[in-house]
Regions:
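Electropositive, gly/pro-rich neighborhoods at or near active sites that engage anionic ligands
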Residues: 30-32, 37-238
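A short, acidic, amphipathic alpha-helical segment used as a generic capping/interface helix at domain edges
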Residues: 85-87, 125-135, 257-269, 273, ...
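Residues at the C-termini of beta-strands that transition into short coil/loop
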Residues: 148, 249-251, 302
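Structural motif
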Residues: 221, 274-275
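Residues at the starts of beta-strands that form the adenosine-phosphate
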Residues: 221, 244, 297
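A mid-sequence, solvent-exposed acidic-amphipathic segment
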Residues: 227-273
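C-terminal functional extensions of proteins
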Residues: 279, 283-329
């Protein structure tokens, strides 16, 4: 592709992004309009709920715009863009190279900062130190995954883009930049958020992503390490292609308080051929790290089956699933 063709390609991509921005603004307008209709008789609700939410959405769109545009143009050297491998590459590394995965999202970062975004895991200084250790570790068998929030957001739904923009403030970006290595290649934390966030629900893409995900545990002896109410695979057939499926049950909240017991149980009941699927909140990343140190393969999957249940239901919005904890993590 010559230079002129590259310029035309960039302009076409930018034009598409402009249209998506217009769609987002239109959705924002409709949200505000509907809120005004619903709240027209309540000045208190308008002042306390609607206007702050509106300001958050507008600020998020404005603050994030330069990153989304710059991502199309050359990864502007003045802006921070961590290198993140694709969903497909991340899964291929798990399947073909036997690599493990520790995921870092807003909750893990907040604990590292010394704050808390979750009700099911209180801040713990030792957990904060361990998460930072894992985030900055350099073990070829453990992939460190972060959320693909830093630049182009065109693959996400309008609601997801608004949430990302509200979170990715300049302050948040500066904190991430101090913690992340610009020379390191990270992986896609959203491999377990493969349905609800994405704007391609009406295509074959979700089914393809699901098919790739299921290859991770195909014919594997799986040990799920989960909170007592998580119930991975209960009420669905997500893990039916596993050779076997056993569980180690951890506390449903503040699992790190029992971390040593959880790790001991994994080492006692697991074998080197087992695949550990971890769903114990921010402790999952630490456990993945420690299991890799002991030559096990472990994947932090979060509430992966909640996405599967939404997919089966053809859900367009997040809804509670009977029998599962109603947390959207």
């Amino acid at each position: 592709m010559n230079e002129l063709e590259q310029i035309i390609s960039i302009m076409e991509q930018f034009q598409k992004e402009q249209q998506q921005m217009k769609n987002d603004i239109n959705n924002l307008y409709n949200t505000v309009k509907n809120s005004l209709i619903m709240q027209k008789n309540s000045t208190t609700d308008m002042n306390e709920r609607v206007l702050p939410a509106l300001k958050l959405m507008i600020d998020g769109l404005g603050n994030n715009l330069k990153y989304e545009i710059a991502d199309y143009i050359t990864h502007n050297n003045h802006l921070f863009f961590p290198k993140i491998e694709s969903h497909k590459t991340t899964i291929n590394n798990i399947i073909n190279e036997g690599k493990s995965l520790a995921r870092f999202g807003d909750g893990e970062f907040s604990i590292i900062y010394g704050t808390n975004r979750w009700s099911f895991q209180q801040y713990d200084e030792q957990l904060s130190e361990r998460l930072l250790q894992v985030l900055q570790s350099d073990n070829d068998k453990l992939m460190i995954a972060i959320a693909d929030n830093y630049g182009d957001l065109s693959k996400y739904t309008s609601e997801s883009k608004s949430e990302i923009r509200a979170y990715m403030t300049d302050e948040t970006r500066k904190k991430h930049e101090t913690l992340l290595n610009k020379n390191k290649t990270y992986h896609d934390a959203y491999i377990t958020r493969w349905y609800m966030m994405m704007n391609d629900k009406k295509t074959e893409a979700p089914a393809n992503r699901l098919s790739n995900l299921k290859k991770i545990w195909n014919n594997k002896n799986v040990i799920a390490v989960e909170g007592e109410f998580t119930r991975l695979g209960v009420g669905n057939n997500l893990f039916d292609n596993a050779a076997s499926f056993k569980r180690i049950i951890a506390p449903g909240t503040n699992s790190f308080r029992k971390y040593d017991d959880i790790l001991d149980a994994c080492l006692k009941y697991g074998s080197k051929n087992d695949l550990f699927l971890l769903a114990i909140g921010p402790s999952s990343g630490v456990l993945a790290y420690d299991l890799v140190q002991n030559d096990y393969q472990a994947i932090d999957v979060g509430h992966i089956d909640l996405e599967y249940m939404w997919y089966l239901a053809g859900a367009e919005n997040r809804t509670s699933i009977p029998g599962s904890i109603p947390k959207f993590v």
